[in-house]
Design a protein with these regions (language model features):
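Loop/turn-to-beta-strand initiation segments
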Residues: 70, 102, 127-130, 166-173
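Phosphate-binding/switch loop-helix module in NTP-utilizing enzymes
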Residues: 107-165
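C-terminal regions of RecA-like/P-loop NTPase motor modules
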Residues: 2-19, 220-249
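Pre-Walker A adenine-sensing motif
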Residues: 24-36
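Conserved nucleotide-binding/hydrolysis micro-motifs of P-loop NTPases
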Residues: 77-81, 109-113, 137-139, 177-181, ...
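Conserved P-loop
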Residues: 43-44, 48-114
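Phosphate-binding/switch region of NTP-binding enzymes
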Residues: 170-232
Length: 249
């Protein structure tokens, strides 16, 4: 049988290409990560109050929602109404994205196991590919009787496994700097950790982002200045941004 050269390209079987990187959609961030986060990974984002952690997470989810990657936000302390208002400051219509099935904002349940189940159920309902937990300290402190100190690490590991395996998501886990250091979570976060800090320079408080750890990615090892602008979280990258990169195995 001779091959028909007139067969249209669309009729030819195409090999499915699986994209291994997830673009954050945050200006400057993906340039520091060789294109984005590793798909189906969990990354810890830590910083003090007012550093912009929630904005970072929202921007990550909004970008995904607008690019066929629905997302889940588990918000422990902020209500939907508060989040809607926060998003509106940057032109993000979170309520519309929710109604469109591109975003789901869920609250903690009465038990930790029920919260895990709600994450799994919601991810299947909307076909989620992204998730943000805001925040880990608030989540765990919500269950003082269920999660004792010795149970925090296995509870955290379970959360990571559920997000990446059961939920099939690439997740950002938000934490407070002091709390994260106290429990040394960076030692067993599966993929990476990003830290937000501030410094006084010439009498002005400047904000900096540092990728402290990101396995399987050649990433910047420098601190990078960032600001919260009308467009959201913006990272400034110097022209010589390729310097100071290393391959983390």
């Amino acid at each position: 049988m001779k091959f028909n050269r007139r067969v249209r390209e669309k009729e030819m079987p195409k090999k499915k290409v699986v994209e291994t990187k997830v673009q954050t959609g945050i200006q400057g961030m993906d340039d520091l990560l060789e294109g984005g986060l590793i798909r189906n990974s969990t990354v810890l984002l830590r910083g003090k109050a007012g550093s912009g952690k929630t904005i970072f997470g929202l921007q990550y989810l909004v970008y995904g929602a607008l690019h066929e990657e629905p997302g889940i936000l588990l918000s422990i302390e902020e209500s939907k109404r508060d989040l809607y208002r926060e998003g509106a400051k940057f032109g993000w219509d979170l309520e519309f994205l929710e109604k469109s099935g591109k975003l789901a904002i869920i609250e903690r349940q009465t038990q930790y196991s029920l919260t895990i189940h709600e994450l799994e159920r919601t991810s299947k309902d909307i076909g989620a590919k992204r998730a943000v937990i805001d925040s880990i300290p608030a989540l765990f402190s919500s269950y003082p009787n269920e999660l004792q100190l010795t149970e925090l690490r296995p509870a955290f590991n379970l959360l990571c496994q559920v997000l990446t395996n059961s939920c099939d998501c690439t997740a950002i886990l938000i934490s407070e700097t002091d709390w994260s250091r106290k429990y040394a979570y960076e030692e067993y976060v599966p993929k990476g950790m990003i830290e937000l800090t501030s410094k006084m320079m010439e009498g002005i408080a400047r904000k900096f982002l540092l990728i402290k750890k990101m396995r399987e990615v050649r990433h910047s090892k420098r601190e990078h200045l960032y600001e919260i602008t009308e467009n959201g979280f913006t990272i400034f990258i110097p022209i010589v941004s390729n310097l100071g990169r290393s391959k983390n195995e």
